[in-house]
Amino acid sequence: MALIVQKFGGTSVGSIERIEQVAEKVKKHREAGDDLVVVLSAMSGETNRLIDLAKQITDQPVPRELDVIVSTGEQVTIALLTMALIKRGVPAVSYTGNQVRILTDSSHNKARILQIDDQKIRADLKEGRVVVVAGFQGVDEHGSITTLGRGGSDTTGVALAAALKADECQIYTDVDGVYTTDPRVVPQARRLEKITFEEMLEMASLGSKVLQIRSVEFAGKYNVPLRVLHSFKEGPGTLITIDEEESMEQPIISGIAFNRDEAKLTIRGVPDTPGVAFKILGPISASNIEVDMIVQNVAHDNTTDFTFTVHRNEYEKAQSVLENTAREIGAREVIGDTKIAKVSIVGVGMRSHAGVASCMFEALAKESINIQMISTSEIKVSVVLEEKYLELAVRALHTAFDLDAPARQGE
């Protein structure tokens, strides 16, 4: 008998019909002998609706009171699912984050989990009940309701699995696993049977929407086996684990991630003096703008060009800050480009194989795709290119690294 934590997102519980379907799935697992803790999000769109209500009162809701409002969304779904389970003869009980003492810090709207008191949950499991817990929320040391921010329900599920030492944390979504890339771009993309935490963390940070990065970090830290599954289709999904595959068939590259939300800024004619990088990026950091990739050209005539990328939503703000910096340090000009994209190859196989970056560059060159920037890590190579070439680049790389070949045995 296994202890499983199951997490269902907003689309999975987006209607009464879907909640009934989730109840059937949970019932089948319980009948198979598993002990179950089920974590739920609010119904799809409900959190936004609640935030909109708050903003009808004030443009800047008090963070503490906003947490009180938005936390009610999960209370609705946990009660409805618990009712649906009891109707089916499955003993069940629902709890809010406060009731099971998911203790967080006091950073309202973006709180971090500090500790979980698992005694109440363990007592219910011992009595044969399915425990249904509200995701996305907790309580601070003062008794105030807190919410965990983006990806919070995934994080709740993983944190509960870690506290309970669960055999597996299952994340149910609208996809049936982690794919080598987005099947909408490459129809030949394959579902991965397994992927490491390290690879998944890179893919999540690079724009993969399957799992939120905080939950992957948490799972990796506490070695919680994660499995991504489809809410309403049967299948093995994808297991995310700390163990690296030791099969001879293991590909060098596990997946290709891409991001359309990048923008590039270049400050030209910068006096080539010590500390110039700080003079440029210091004000950017002080403006709370996150920088991704950075390139500084070789100095020429005692001046240099400095290029970096930011999220497209931060482009105008970053451009304004950079133009002020350019005037202060005597740079020639600032130019920007919002029509770029980032494409990355990810795989632990890079550690033991040389020439991976060269293969990537060759595949792009064959399609006459110019590379504007390059960034590497131990298991990742990222490039920036013109946005119009994004899908062509992804397809070319998918083929070059044999990712659209027939699935390996076991998939």
Curated annotation (Swiss-Prot):
Gene Ontology MF terms: aspartate kinase activity; ATP binding
Leading EC class: transferase
Pathways involved: Amino-acid biosynthesis; L-lysine biosynthesis via DAP pathway; (S)-tetrahydrodipicolinate from L-aspartate: step 1/4; Amino-acid biosynthesis; L-methionine biosynthesis via de novo pathway; L-homoserine from L-aspartate: step 1/3; Amino-acid biosynthesis; L-threonine biosynthesis; L-threonine from L-aspartate: step 1/5
Keyword Transferase annotated: yes
Residue intervals passing through the bilayer: none
PANTHER family given in the database record: ASPARTATE KINASE (PTHR21499), ASPARTOKINASE (PTHR21499:SF3)
Name of the protein described by the UniProt record: Aspartate kinase
Organism: Pseudomonas putida (strain ATCC 47054 / DSM 6125 / CFBP 8728 / NCIMB 11950 / KT2440)
